[in-house]
Amino acid sequence: MNAHRTLIISVFIVASCGLAYELIIAALASYLLGDSILQFSSVIGLYLFSMGIGAHLTQYIKDKDVLHRFIEIELLVGVIGGISALALFVAFGLSAAPFRTLLYAFVLIVGAVVGMEIPLVMRVLNQKGAEFKELVSKVLTFDYLGALAVSLLFPLLLAPKLGMARSALLFGIFNAAVAYLTARVFKAELPRYRAIRLRALIVLSILAVIFAYADRISFKAEQSYFGDPVVYQSHSPYQRLVVTRWKDDTRLYINGNLQFSSRDEARYHEALVLPAMQMVPNAERVLILGGGDGLAAREVLKYPQVKNVTLVDLDPDMTATFKTSATLSALNQGSLSHPKMHVVNDDAAKWLEGSSEKFDVIIIDLPDPSNFSLGKLYSVPMYRLVARHLQPQGKIVVQSTSPYFAPNAYWSVVATLEAAKLNTAPYHVYVPSFGEWGFVLAGFDKQFPVPQKFDVPTSYLNAQTAAEMFRFPPDMARRKVEANYLNNQILVSYFESDWNNVMR
C-alpha cells in the first residue's frame, strides 16, 4: 500500500478512536456517577487539556524517531484506551471511591497519548515530502471526518449493540491495527521491524481475547456492584437497564439508580395512580408519561371503566423488555399487552406537542430531574403543555422525588405546577427500598378529596393510609423555593444539592 495513503487512512482511524474513548469515558461517568452535564463537561475539558499536553510533548521526539514513536504510541493507546471502560466497570463494582481517581487517570493518560498522534503523523508526512498546505488540509479533513463517523456510529450502533466495554476494546483493536499496518508499510525504514510487528500482534491478540470475554467480566463487575445476581442488562441509546433478582425480590436499575423493588413497588404505584383515579370516578381515558415498566398501567387497568390507556415512553428497549420477558411481564400483569393499552415510544414533550387528545387522568412517572434533559420535563412550559391535554375535571399526578431527602427539589415541583396555573395537593408515602417518597396531584379545580375507600383491590392503600399520605410532619414542611423554568433549570440544582447533602 502507498505510504502516503496509509498515513492518511491512519489519521481517519486514530481520530475516530480518539473521540470514541472520550465519548465512552464521559458516558460511563454520567451513567455511573449521574449528573451528565457535569460529567461530560469535566471529562471532555480534561481530555482536551491532556491532548494539548500530549501535542506539546511531541516536540521533544527526534525526527529520526518519529515513525517508531508513532507506532509505539498507537500500541499504547490501543491498550490503555481499549481496556479503559472495562477497568472502570470493575473499579466501580469494587468501590465508587477509587473509581473517580481511575476515571480521571484514564482521561489524562488517554488524552495525552491521543494528543501526540496527529502531530507525529504530520511530521512523518512532512518527512515524506508532502507539501505543507496539502499536508495540513488532508490531515485535518480526515481528522474531522473520523470524528464525524464515530460521533454517529457510537450512539446509534456501537453502544447499543456492543456496550461500552466492547466498544472501547474494538477501538483499541483499531489502534493496534494501525500500528501493525504502518509497521508493515514502512518496514524498510524500521531497524527493529520484527520486534515491532511481534509487539503489535501480541497487543492485537490480547485485546481480541479480552473483547471475547468483556461481557462476562463486566457482568461479574455489575453483580458485585448491585449485590444481587444480574438477570438482565441492556444498553439502549437512551439509558442502561439492569434487572437483578434475589429470591422473591426483582429490582430494576436505570443508569445505576434503583427504579423499583418488587417487594414494595405496590406502595409506590398504588400511591402514584389510585388517588387520582378515585378523584375522577368516570375516568375513561388515561395518559401515562414514562412508566415504561408497565407497573403504573397495571394499577390503571384495575378500573373497568377505563377504555383507553396511552403510555408514552422514550425507550423502546424498556417497553419491549417489560412486555416480552416472562418474569417482568408477570410483575405488571401483562399490562403492556392489554388490548386497552397503546404504547408510544417517543419523547413525552414532543408527543404532547403533536397530539390534540384530551385525557381524564394524566400520570407522569418520569425519572428524577437529575440532569437538564430530564429537568425540562419538570418545567413550567412542560406542565402548561400537559394541562392542554387535561379534561376540565381531570387530574394530573407527578412523581416528585423525596420530600424528606430532597425537600427543595420536591417543593420546587409543587411551585412549578402552581406557576403553570394549576392547583396542587402534595402527598407522600413511605417505600422501604426508597425511603419517604413524594407525589403531587394537580388540576384546574381546587377539589382534591382524600379517598375514603378504593374501588379496586389494593395491597397497601386504604382510607387510613390515604389520609396519612396528605399530612406532612414539620421536617417535611413546605419550603420557599423557586419554580423550574427552562432558562434556569433551578430544579436540577436543587436536586443535586439535596442529594449531595444526603451522601455526605
Which residues make up each language-model segment?
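Alpha-helical transmembrane segments of multi-pass membrane proteins
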Residues: M1-Q233, P237-N257, S261-L328, Q333-P432, ...
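SAM/dcSAM-binding transferase cores
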Residues: D445-R504
